[in-house]
A protein has these predicted regions:
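Active-site gating/metal-coordination segments in enzymes
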Residues: 1-83, 90, 134-141
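Active-site glycine-centered loops adjacent to acidic/histidine catalytic or metal-binding residues
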Residues: 171
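Short, electropositive alpha-helical surface patch
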Residues: 1-12, 95-102, 152-161, 183-193
Length: 209
């Protein structure tokens, strides 16, 4: 990715989010190697888990290694089920200097039967200043999604986090393979849903953030 950026006329991608297993004893060594790349900004680790006792956010080794994110001044992309949000809040509060980015709109899959639960989770976690929200991934869990369906989530997310702490993303090619949706269809829906935003607000959620 760094090679691609170096050769691109606009230096895209201008930021790289990598992976390090924070439960691994070599986590610090892996992070040090990543730091050699100019555009490296943070890591992403999938923490989705429906078994509370096995949740990595309760693992002492994982929590100890998480201090490395703070040490290297990196961001952390957090992918969880929204039912895990209270554990996530505990972790986020422990590391107030780390910028957290909640992935895929706090994964609302279970909200089909508990929309109020997802809404509560979004509103509570948005109360933490060091958290931003990435709005994406609907096609990965809702194969027959449509603009009206995802607008319910997007409007609540924007209201909770505000345009300064939200960003839109495509989740491609994963969404393409699962929902058979085109890249353009997601962006067309996003633009339609956010048509009420001012130019500055739209620039924030689609470019600057």
């Amino acid at each position: 990715m760094q090679k691609i950026s170096n050769s691109h006329p606009l230096k895209f991608p201008n930021a790289i989010i990598g992976f390090v297993d924070l439960k691994d004893s070599d986590a610090e060594k892996d992070l040090e190697e990543h730091m050699n790349f100019q555009n490296f900004r943070g890591i992403r680790q999938i923490l989705k888990n429906k078994e509370h006792d096995n949740d990595l956010m309760l693992n002492n080794i994982w929590l100890e290694n998480f201090k490395l994110i703070n040490k290297f001044e990196l961001s952390f992309d957090l992918l969880i089920y929204y039912s895990q949000y209270k554990l996530a809040i505990d972790v986020i509060k422990k590391f107030p200097n780390v910028q957290f980015v909640i992935n895929h709109c706090l994964w609302p899959e279970e909200s089909i039967g508990d929309f109020e639960g997802w809404t509560t989770a979004i509103r509570e976690i948005s109360g933490l200043d060091n958290v931003a929200l990435k709005i994406s991934g609907f096609g990965e869990w809702k194969i027959d999604w449509n603009t009206n369906f995802i607008s319910n989530y997007i409007n609540i997310a924007l209201d909770a986090f505000g345009t300064k702490r939200c960003m839109f993303a495509s989740n491609f090619p994963v969404d393409k393979f699962i929902s058979h949706s085109s890249y353009e269809s997601f962006w067309s829906s996003y633009f339609k849903i956010t048509s009420h935003l001012s130019n500055d607000e739209a620039n924030d959620v689609f470019m600057k953030n």
